[in-house]
Amino acid sequence: MDREQFYKEVYSITKEIPYGNVFTYGKIAQLIGNPQYSRMVGQALSYAPKEEDLPCHRVVNSQGRLVPSWQKQKELLEKEGITFKRNGCVNMSKHLWDITGSLTSTIGISPTSATWL
């Protein structure tokens, strides 16, 4: 898969993250079939065209850490009701997007191929 196609798939998945939920760079990379490319997911989101209107603020690292240089991310998440632990990380057990119901209908991935969820 070339970079352009990878970016398109990142954008497609990111668009589907529901209000009040977060998802991780690593899980997006796994869904695309390149689990080792979580950093490339972050790169794709940093280059996302404004017209895509992606909810990039809903993508966090696997521990729930936010982008250090993006102060508005926490504000946007708080407006959606996202809660944080004392260490400043998103409460992942409460807000991580459970995509099992969305896989086939929205993203087009078979639930059997996503056993890691």
Give each language-model segment a name.
Residues 1-117:
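Nucleic acid-binding interface residues in structured DNA/RNA-binding domains
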